[in-house]
Amino acid sequence: MATLILPTARAQNNASIHTSWLWHLHQPIYWPEERAGSDHYENAWDTIQAQGAGRSHPVEQVRGQVFDIDDRRAAYQCRPHDALASIGQYVKSGAQLNYSGALMENVQSLGAAGQLGYASNWYQSNKDAKGWTTSGGKSRVDLTNFSYHHALAPFLSDETLEMELRIHKRQMQLLWGDPTSHGYFPAEACFSERMIPILNKINIAWTVIANNHLARACSDFPLVIGSGGENCDLPNRADQINPAQGAGNYQRLTIDRGCSPTSAMPFSFQTHYARHVDPNTGTESKIIVVPSDQALGWKDSYSTWDLGLLNGLNARNNPNKPSLVLLAHDGDNAWSGGYSYYMEWVPNFASQ
């Protein structure tokens, strides 16, 4: 994982907090019917042609409402590359890019047909950026693993999850080459420790999780429900086995969805190990969990935001286990899919 050491953190002796982004890109297979004359489902160009010939489904006009939008054309081909090029003077800077398998197929179909402004080598900019390295020798664009069709992993059988991950990894190899990432972004941040043995099996070493799951499992989590608090399942007291953090070490930030996610500082901004123990054999599997902040990720998706919101975390930062603010969100929707985000806010953020 490539990170940016945030200069706004004013602690001395290189005790700054770290920041990074994960930009998630996805479009589904809009009409998964078998393509005429083949054993494969339709991709974007197939569906566009069928709609152009008068077919009424799917409801979405895949040409005009989905792929034929300038910001998406750029996001799916070159804009993450361009954004990171704009901050190349920061030698530790980088981001994670999460590109679904379904989107790869859709864009590949448009590029192969020379349609809607997609090039046959649409993948090249990401491949080039993957070859850039930080001062620590890490790829500046870490193209992370994902369930190929945006499947919600905890609801899959072990066999299905393994196959979704393997075909996604293989598609990344074909487009962007080896080595593939050791990281994983779960669709909709849906994670369960039951998945850990499968992730281990295919050489995934770390996974993103929503950091409110770390906070809500602390024994002194200050639960507030409703519009001023959580909008998720209430914590099970039997799961609250993370250490107490102290009343002054929780931060509750309001976002526009009518809730206020709560984070523990610095606990839910630090990496941890999660484990799964097979109840039949006692075999233990472990994985590193990398927390993404729910409130700050939301804010980064929709507008510029005041980096002073990180002051409380910075004051509690442990230089022996530095805090990481991971801003994980869509890179092709809302404000964070546009030029102003990638080419203005990203360099502005990095310079502060």
Please tell me what each predicted stretch does.
Residues 97-187, 284-300, 322, 326:
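Metal-dependent polysaccharide deacetylase catalytic core of the NodB/CE4 family, i.e.
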Residues 115-142, 166, 178, 200-274:
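Acidic, His- and aromatic-enriched active-site or binding-groove loops in soluble protein domains
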Residues 249-352:
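Catalytic grooves of carbohydrate-active enzymes
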Residues 28-32, 103-109, 151-155, 191-195, ...:
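Short catalytic/ligand-binding loop motif for oxyanion handling, primarily in non-cytosolic enzymes
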Residues 34-70, 134-150, 225-244, 288:
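Aromatic- and acidic-residue-enriched carbohydrate-binding clefts of CAZyme catalytic domains
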Residues 12-132:
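N-terminal regions that are enriched for targeting/export leaders
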Residues 193-208, 342-352:
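Short, surface-exposed basic-aromatic patches at helix termini and helix-loop junctions that form
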Residues 1-12:
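Sec-dependent, cleavable N-terminal signal peptides
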